[in-house]
Amino acid sequence: MSRLVVVSNRIAPPDNKGGAGGLAVGVLGALKAAGGLWFGWSGETGNEDEPLKKVTKGNITWASFNLSEQDYEDYYCQFSNAVLWPAFHYRLDLVQFQRPAWEGYMRVNALLADKLLPLIKENDIIWVHDYHLLPFASELRKRGVNNRIGFFLHIPFPTPEIFNALPPHDELLEQLCDFDLLGFQTENDRLAFLDSLSSQTRVTTRSGKHHIAWGKDFQTEVYPIGIEPDEIALQAAGPLPPKLVQLKAELKNVKNIFSVERLDYSKGLPERFLAYEALLENYPQHRGKIRYTQIAPTSRGEVQAYQDIRHQLETEAGRINGRYGQLGWTPLYYLNQHFDRKLLMKIFRYSDVGLVTPLRDGMNLVAKEFVAAQDPANPGVLVLSQFAGAANELTSALIVNPYDRDDVAAALNRALTMPLAERISRHAEMLDVIVKNDINRWQERFIHDLKEVTPRSAERRQQNNVATFPKLA
């Protein structure tokens, strides 16, 4: 039986007592089934030459390493999060490309390949995650690794007009072709990648999803990531802590609109605040009878763009409350702090509307978690951005354009006044999708497809490396 090796920028420590996110749950499920290794950065800066820190529990080994301050800055802060993250979320205006950061990104991917190489066994299958590690398969191939290597991109893949604006776009595309299997959240992301590839070289495609580019064979497929709906339902329905009992009492006479995500410009939070203001302006009958709570803990607080959006939200929240607030009623609660994930599931359950309106998002698991947390007999309504990957699956949500504040306001009004029968019907349809495509189904499909790939031989790889095709005119 093949062993599974998972590679990600960060690893979830084995003693993590907090609620695990989507990646951790899916990865651990796959590792428990096959046994294997989870390899990634420890989250600490220090001496890169120190031996890997290894912890084994059951049939899983966690192997982590430190990064130097310089590599952390170049690889993680600069290229991954100041170039790739904004570009892949369609924000070229925020891209800060610097050649030393690109060199640092490549240097760290090579370093990680060197560290992982002694741990790889002949029949291992390797599953690499996300934008921090786009060149990783290429680095392993250079070191003679012929194992099956798969890659899953958790964030969107931008259209060629966006992606090809990145100075090293051609190198990144060719490096991605060294993976055997490339997984995307949506069909739009998969096609955007192939369109970018076709703009740089000739791509031969057979059976729809088997491709050859730069003489390299690879496959592409769509794997929308899921959640653990049963676990979330249990968390949501459990006993309420005292603070939430008090909150529930406060919300007894108002309808609650609730949103939670980390503070990030891709989430559309300023646009969301303005849409809520449009609701209060266009539908004054709701004034004094609703409350919008936005939880947005700080993320990457050292980055200027994130500091700017935090200040913008604080200003807008104060302005909206000052304009529409009344004695005894505050229309908008903005909380820039972290809340326990299990507590959030309980808050979801007692919310009348879940407002999830990112400007661009690979999937957005919050939308799925909101649905899973609801009481099926009296569910809340999900208002969801058309630019979230989840909108492709949760078609019974109220789908909106987050750039159109009046559209979002109208959807909020509809959600607040929706009859119970319609709420139950829409919720049941979405829950059925979530249950059928849960986190275990996601990882099982990917691992199954990766195992079906024919391993690369050294001879085949050498032949592929010299085979080239002219770019399309």
Curated annotation (Swiss-Prot):
The record marks 85, 155 as: Involved in alpha anomer selectivity. The keyword Protein biosynthesis does not apply. GO terms for molecular function: alpha,alpha-trehalose-phosphate synthase (UDP-forming) activity. It is an enzyme of class 2 (transferase). Its EC number is 2.4.1.15. The keyword Glycosyltransferase applies. It catalyses: D-glucose 6-phosphate + UDP-alpha-D-glucose = alpha,alpha-trehalose 6-phosphate + UDP + H(+). One of its GO terms (biological process) is trehalose biosynthetic process. It comes from the Bacteria. Pfam families: Glyco_transf_20. Pathway: Glycan biosynthesis; trehalose biosynthesis. Keywords: Glycosyltransferase, Transferase. Belongs to the glycosyltransferase 20 family. Homotetramer. This is Trehalose-6-phosphate synthase.
